[in-house]
Amino acid sequence: MITLEATKQVADDSPDHICPVGAVRDNFTSQGLIEEVKDGFDNEQIAMLDLGCAGGQFVVDFINKGDIGIGLEGSSNSLQGIGKDNWDKYHNKNLFLCDITKDYQIYQVGEPMEFDFIHSEEVFEHISPDDVDAMLKNIFKHLKEDGLCVFGVSLVPDVRNEKGEDMVPPFAPEDRTIGYEGKLFTLHQSVFPATWWKDKIESHGFKIFKEGLHNENHFGYLFNHIVRGAGYSGNVPGYAGWDESAYFCCTK
């Protein structure tokens, strides 16, 4: 039995909960990445954790392969979103509501869990700068020695109106906030260069792989697939928008 002890379950003060977009619209997965990760662990059963799991399909696809899959999501709107079937089946079993910027611990049969594989794409930038350190600290304590993390972080702004419509480039063709009298929601609260994220990740003890893809925005990326990226839903590095995200593969 898997349980979660969380200081706070719903990030009810987050713009992503108040103006839900990804929590209700996103249910991305990547069979290609799953196969690559499984191959890296010699196709043995692994424990995986997905942070900001939205509809939960990436987690469910690992479960369907016999793995221990856990997803954490900060908005309760996800329960009625595109991944409703997943949440109906796995809520409080494998999919949990959790504010990942507050202290939490996942347990299996009463013992603290550590994970072979931890994944988070298009999540870190949604976290307030003041909460990034706490988020990374929580991730690090849940990672096994010699475990693997895949982090994908958007580097571009994302502002929405009350209808969830894009208001600024690159997702909107022009800046629509000028003269707009309605309410605006800044979903990407932490828009920083890739090197800022690299330094922040390393400051919490994560070790970026020397192998893999290394360039201006990508650090040790070991795989030929991703789950998504920069809102374009690409499953293969190099798709349109690839350079609008930073990708990291790291271990303890």
Role assignments for model-derived ranges:
Residues M1-M113, F117-E121, D133-L136, G212, ...:
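Conserved N-terminal segment of class I S-adenosyl-L-methionine
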Residues N27, N86, T101, I127-K144, ...:
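S-adenosyl-L-methionine-dependent methyltransferase catalytic module, highlighting the catalytic core
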Residues E122-H126:
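Short catalytic micro-motifs in class I SAM-dependent methyltransferases
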